[in-house]
């Protein structure tokens, strides 16, 4: 598809060291990350190792180092996501977050998740499990350095009680807020979370939301609920999730051209953060391999608050005129002319 073609063109420009328009074996040995891994005899598998063609997305972004240190967050380990596009020097890299946590107990939880997917590694038995083939796991609780941490790995089957899923953890945390909810999200389309947020708004909880510009104005985005507009999700379910008191604090950040808001975090009452690889979507909850952590700690929350304020300053708020016009059409017209895209989980 066009997205993959663009990615390959970007890689070509980066790997073509002598600029002759061709990629030599020497250039690939120096610039191709997977080739470097293979050349170093580091074992690797992908999410087809369970015998499938890759179910959903292997969307994790974590490392476990020496069974002691965990690195996790929203950042893909790519040049574009962290540093910016090689061919576009004006880009700065996507807006992301990473956490480094030194805890053997936490590392054990992530090592278990890794081992479920790894099985016995390349070759050998077909015992790797990805996506919906993995067993459902409960929410785990632990204390690290005075911080209360909850961990949840996805996906969960569709019939799993909502509160036991990752999106359920998000919803439960939001339901307990008293003062504020600030969210910076790549994509946001979970209607149940939107409903819980609407309930908190009616109880005078201050809500501010930033969503990446690629998704904020999509017909199915839950930003539409917050703006008082009907989404195509409402059309399909026949239930209205439209907020009766539209928000003026929902919009998109102004980033360098080509950069994305790739965060997947929420800050609740300036003391609890929700972060990880988990986009706030149905696919993240029930299809993809994902990580979600909830950390109760004011110091950690203050770092995320600073990042949110940086993005919020100068943001563009409210729906576009084009979106308002589009939502004025009947549901039949909208659903038939513009089916929901499946690209929401590509990051």
Model-assigned labels for residue ranges:
Residues 1-175, 212-271, 278-293, 298:
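HKD-type phospholipase D/PLD-like phosphodiesterase module
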Residues 38, 201-202:
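Anion (oxyanion) recognition and catalysis
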Residues 45-46, 180-185, 209:
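Short catalytic-loop micro-motif centered on adjacent basic/acidic residues
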Residues 172, 192-199:
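A short acidic, amphipathic alpha-helical/loop segment
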Residues 186-192:
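Acidic-and-aromatic substrate-binding clefts and catalytic sites of carbohydrate-active enzymes
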Residues 203-207:
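A short helix->loop->beta-strand "cap" motif at the edges of active sites that frequently abuts
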Residues 251-254, 258-264, 268-347:
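Long, C-terminal catalytic modules of enzymes
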């Amino acid at each position: 598809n066009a997205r993959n073609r663009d990615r390959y063109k970007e890689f070509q420009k980066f790997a073509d060291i002598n600029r002759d328009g061709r990629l030599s074996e020497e250039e690939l040995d120096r610039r191709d990350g997977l080739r470097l891994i293979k050349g170093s005899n580091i074992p690797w598998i992908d999410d087809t190792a369970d015998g499938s063609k890759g179910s959903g997305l292997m969307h994790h972004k974590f490392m476990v180092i020496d069974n002691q240190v965990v690195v996790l967050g929203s950042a893909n380990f790519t040049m574009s996501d962290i540093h910016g596009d090689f061919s576009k020097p004006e880009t700065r890299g996507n807006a992301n977050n990473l956490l480094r946590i030194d805890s053997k107990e936490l590392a054990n939880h992530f090592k278990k998740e890794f081992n479920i997917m790894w099985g016995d590694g390349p070759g050998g038995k077909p015992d790797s499990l990805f996506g919906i083939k993995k067993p459902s796991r409960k929410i785990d609780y632990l204390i690290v350095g005075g911080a209360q941490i909850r961990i949840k790995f996805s996906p969960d089957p569709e019939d799993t009680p909502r509160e036991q899923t990752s999106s359920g953890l998000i919803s439960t945390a939001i339901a307990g807020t008293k003062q504020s909810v600030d969210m910076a999200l790549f994509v946001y389309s979970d209607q149940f979370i939107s409903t819980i947020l609407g309930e908190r708004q009616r109880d005078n909880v201050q809500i501010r939301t930033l969503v990446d510009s690629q998704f904020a104005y999509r017909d199915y985005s839950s930003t539409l609920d917050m703006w008082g507009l009907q989404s195509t999700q409402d059309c399909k379910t026949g239930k209205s999730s439209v907020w009766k008191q539209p928000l003026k604090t929902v919009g998109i950040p102004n980033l360098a051209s080509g950069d994305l808001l790739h965060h997947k975090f929420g800050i609740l009452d300036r003391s609890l953060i929700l972060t990880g690889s988990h986009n706030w979507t149905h696919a993240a909850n029930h299809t993809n391999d994902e990580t979600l952590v909830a950390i109760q700690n004011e110091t950690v929350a203050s770092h995320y608050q600073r990042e949110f304020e940086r993005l919020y300053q100068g943001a563009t708020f409210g729906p576009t005129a084009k979106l308002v016009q589009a939502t004025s059409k009947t549901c039949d017209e909208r659903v038939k002319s513009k089916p929901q895209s499946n690209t929401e989980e590509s990051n």
